[in-house]
Amino acid sequence: MSDPSFDVVSEISRPELTNAVTQALGEIKNRFDFKGSKSDIQLEDEQLVLVSDNEAKLESVIDVLVSKMAKRGLGLKNFDFKSKVEPATGGTVRMKVKIRKGMEKEQTKEVTRIIKESKLKVNVTIMGESVRVTGKKKDDLQEVIHLLKNADFPFDVQFTNYK
């Protein structure tokens, strides 16, 4: 039997994101302060497009969306809410929020470094946009998960592919 292992990834659950957007749109449609507003959220492949009448309403759209995402367990570090607001058609404003998928090379190295500094008896392998952690004992793997959950990365980490 092979040793227990898991993968450390940085991904967004697409169905959960779709649900969060749908719930946010439902709340925007029913809220009094959005009556008659042209506010909208569109989910595209690699980004969210937020549209509203003005910057103040756009901030409210972001607040509604962020609250729905948090309730659905989506990590907010994988979304770039700091992009600039640009004018759109019909006197509206638009913001494109980039969705980050996977870990970059530097991020995988940082995860690997933190695990190796812990001196736990596990093997760490970088596999493209993820990191595979293998160990003889499940307790060591659980300690690694606890360590990574408490680490302050500029991206969200999830744990998948438990074997």
Swiss-Prot record:
UniProt keyword annotations, A-Z: Nucleotide-binding
Cellular component (GO) terms are: cytosol
Record keyword Ion transport present: no
Q: Which InterPro entries match?
A: DUF520, UPF0234-like_C, UPF0234_N, YajQ-like_sf
Top-rank taxon: Bacteria
**Pfam families with a match to the protein in the record:** DUF520
GO molecular function, a single term: nucleotide binding
User: What is the purpose of this protein?
Assistant: Nucleotide-binding protein.
Question: What family classification does the UniProt entry report for this protein?
Answer: Belongs to the YajQ family.
Which PANTHER family does the entry mention? Answer: UPF0234 PROTEIN YAJQ (PTHR30476:SF0)
Q: Which HAMAP family match?
A: YajQ
Name the UniProt record assigns to this protein: Nucleotide-binding protein LBJ_2391
Q: Which organism is it from?
A: Leptospira borgpetersenii serovar Hardjo-bovis (strain JB197)
